[in-house]
Each structure stands twice: as structure tokens, then as C-alpha cells.
Amino acid sequence: MKKANKKSVYFGLTNDIIFGWIMKSEENCLAIIRAILPELNITNIVHKEIQHDITPVTSTRGVRFDAVVQDDQKRYYDIEMQVENTSDLGKRARYYQSQIDNETLMKGQTFHKLKESFDILLSTFDPFSYGLRRYQFHQYEDSIRDLRLDTHSHELFINSKGTKGEISNGLAGIIDVMNQKPNQANPLASKLMKEIAYYNQDSEKRRKLMDYEARLLDERSIGEEKGRQEEGNRNVRNIIIAFKANKAETSYIFQFLKLRT
């Protein structure tokens, strides 16, 4: 009896590599930004960098942007795919904004030259549990909600699990693609799904995807093992502290440690 073939793993838009390939296309990049921010009437992209690493001169800590884009009005967009709810998205957005400012403000320029920027996180979960499909944040005076501080910076979160709020037809299509929901009636969704299907079927592209996933599994396994070791060390330290607090003999503590090795 022949064994049934295992179903191939499908790599969707939320995969880092797939998302990077999609965003390398200027046409896709423009369409996605226009879908998220239709009110800006963006007509052209003049510069984009995909999987762009930034390490500030004053710091050893760098950040990798999934996609950094500049339009013809000199506005900047940082577009990130977020698949894990780390509960620090506010700080993450703040950090990304600061790095965009550092990257775009030339040495010697004053803050007056800061460009308008949009930090966009496409999330596979509802980051704020209000059910909105599109969250947008600005700074307001605490007691006067009509008074907005114009920092020329914007934070947006696209919630693929949301059901509330009016959004563009294009953004609805992007959300369908994130959820791997076929939507042939939506032009943008149909186009993106076809490209993603090609990446999954092309042998060379698929090999790169599988290699990337294997590296992620290795790194996760190493991280988990390291975490277990650190937890074990903390437990031993706490036990030793407890022994000492109860005036245990040193020989007894050594015997305990010997039994654990």
C-alpha cells in the first residue's frame, strides 16, 4: 500500500522571505501602501530598501527593517510583518520611528528637516483587542482630545483578525492574503496570491524558504535549550540561598550540587 503524500507546507505572505520578495516589486509596494493609506493619494515611489539593516553610530544595537520606502512627496514608510505578540508593540513602534529619523536626518541637519514618517505593522493578531482592522495612533493632549501634537509621525497597526472599521478594498484584500483566504474578486489579493503561489512552486525559491525555516527551528531550539539551562541555574542559586538562610552545612550544600551534576 502506498503511503499518502504529506501535504506540502505553504509559505504565505506573513513569512519573512515571502514578504520581502513581494515588497521588492515597486508595483506591489506602491499598491500595498496605497491600500493602507488611501487618503494620501500616493502616486510614485522614488526609493525603497528591503530587509534593510541599520546600526546607529552611537550604538552597537541595530534594527532590520522589512521595507523602508520613500514616496515622491519625501514621506517615509516603514512596513513590518509582525507574527508574534510580544506585548511591547508600542515601544517597538517608537524604536522604529527613532531609527527612521536617525536614518533620514542627514548629519548636521536640524530637526526642522525631519520627514513625515509612517510606521506600519501588519500583525497576524489583534494587538489591542478592539477588533479594528486598522488602528492609527497620534499624540493628543490628555484632557483636550481635539488638540493634537503634530510630530509628523504616524503609527499604524493592521489587524488581520479584525472585523470592525471601514477600510479600503485593497486593504481588505491584503488581510485576506494574510489569512490565506482566496479572493479572486479582489484584484490586489488575486495578484499577490498568484505571486506567492509561484514562490511556493518554484524549486529554487522553495529551497530558500525551507532553508530559512530550518534555520529558524535551529535558532529556536538553541534558544529554548539556553533558556532551560538558565532556569536551572536560577533554581540552583535560589536553593543555595535558601540553604544558607537556614544555616545548612557547607558540606551538605556541596553534596547537593554533586547529586545534580
Model-found features: residue ranges?
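Accessory alpha/beta interaction modules
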Residues: 1-154, 164, 222
